[in-house]
C-alpha cells in the first residue's frame, strides 16, 4: 500500500506548435502528452523514490493508457485508477502567447473522471498512507467536492498528513461550495504549497510575513511559497530557506 496518495484528474495535453496560435484558426498541434496536475505530482514523487498511488478514472482509450503506462513506468501504483466503459479520458488543448500566458480548452467536465465519487474510493487503500496530496484544480464539480469533503475527516482520523497546492483559477472562488471546501482544506493542511499571490488571496492578508505567521499559528507545519523562475521559499520550524530555481 502506498505512503503518498492523490486523487484527481489524469488527462492528455495537446499543445499548439506556434506562439500566439489561436483556437479560432487551423494550426498545428503536438502531443498527446501525459498530464493532469495531480498525475504530474504523484509521478514526480515516485521518481524521487516515494511509495505512491493515485485514485482516478480514465477512459478505455489510448489517451488513458499513455498516462497509465507512464505512471506505472515511474513507479506509481495504478490499481485504483478505474477505467470507464462510456466516457473518454480528459483532454486539455493549450496554446501559448509571447507573454507566457496560455489559453486552454478542457474536456474534463464530461470526461471519465466525472464517474468518480466517494463511494468508489477504497478506504483500505489508505492503510499505510502517510501523506495525501490535494490539487485545488481538481475541485471542479460536485463529485470532487463530495470526495474531498468526506476524505478530510477520514484522513485526519487516521493521522494522515494533508498536503495542499491550491493551483486554482480565481473564478473557482466565486462558487460558494468550492470556496468553502478550499478554506476547509487549508484549515486542515499540514503542508501548503501556494504561489505568492495565492498565499495572500487565501489568507486575506497583504504581506507574506503576516500570512506565514497566520498559517503557522493555525497549525500548518511546512509552507513552500512558489516564485516561478525565482525559485521558492521554504518556511519550517520558524526558519526560512530561499531555494533557487533549477
Predicted regions and their residues:
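Conserved beta-alpha-beta core of the PfkB/ribokinase-like small-molecule kinase fold
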Residues: 131, 137-214, 230-232
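Conserved phosphate-binding/catalytic region of the ribokinase-like
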Residues: 1-5, 154, 208-246
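Glycine-rich phosphate/adenosyl-contacting loop at the front of the ribokinase-like
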Residues: 1-76
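Conserved N-terminal subdomain of the carbohydrate kinase-like
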Residues: 51-134
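Structural detector of well-ordered beta-strand residues that form the stable sheet scaffold
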Residues: 5, 53, 162-163, 224
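Glycine-centered short loops/turns at secondary-structure junctions
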Residues: 49, 75, 157-159, 219
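Alpha-helix/helix-capping structural signal
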Residues: 9-10, 197, 238
Amino acid at each position: 500500500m502506498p505512503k503518498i496518495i492523490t486523487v484527481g484528474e489524469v488527462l492528455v495535453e495537446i499543445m499548439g506548435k506556434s506562439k500566439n496560435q489561436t483556437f479560432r484558426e487551423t494550426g498545428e498541434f503536438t502531443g498527446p502528452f501525459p498530464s493532469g496536475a495531480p498525475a504530474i505530482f504523484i509521478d514526480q514523487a515516485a521518481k524521487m523514490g516515494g511509495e505512491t498511488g493515485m485514485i482516478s478514472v480514465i477512459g478505455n482509450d489510448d489517451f488513458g493508457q499513455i498516462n497509465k503506462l507512464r505512471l506505472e513506468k515511474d513507479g506509481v501504483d495504478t490499481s485504483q485508477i478505474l477505467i470507464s466503459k462510456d466516457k473518454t479520458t480528459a483532454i486539455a488543448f493549450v496554446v501559448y502567447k509571447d507573454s507566457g500566458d496560455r489559453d486552454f480548452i478542457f474536456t474534463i467536465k464530461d470526461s471519465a473522471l466525472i464517474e468518480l465519487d466517494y463511494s468508489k474510493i477504497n478506504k483500505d487503500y489508505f492503510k499505510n498512507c502517510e501523506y495525501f496530496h490535494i490539487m485545488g484544480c481538481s475541485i471542479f464539480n460536485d463529485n470532487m467536492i463530495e470526495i474531498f469533503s468526506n476524505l478530510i475527516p477520514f484522513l485526519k482520523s487516521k493521522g494522515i498528513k494533508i498536503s495542499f497546492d491550491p493551483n486554482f483559477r480565481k473564478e473557482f472562488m466565486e462558487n460558494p461550495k468550492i470556496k468553502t471546501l478550499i478554506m476547509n482544506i487549508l484549515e486542515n493542511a499540514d503542508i501548503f504549497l501556494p504561489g505568492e499571490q495565492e498565499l495572500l488571496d487565501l489568507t486575506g492578508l497583504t504581506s507574506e510575513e503576516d500570512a506565514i505567521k497566520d498559517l503557522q499559528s493555525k497549525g500548518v507545519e511546512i509552507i513552500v511559497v512558489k516564485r516561478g523562475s525565482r525559485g521558492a521559499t521554504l518556511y519550517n520550524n520558524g526558519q526560512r530557506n530561499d531555494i533557487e530555481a533549477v
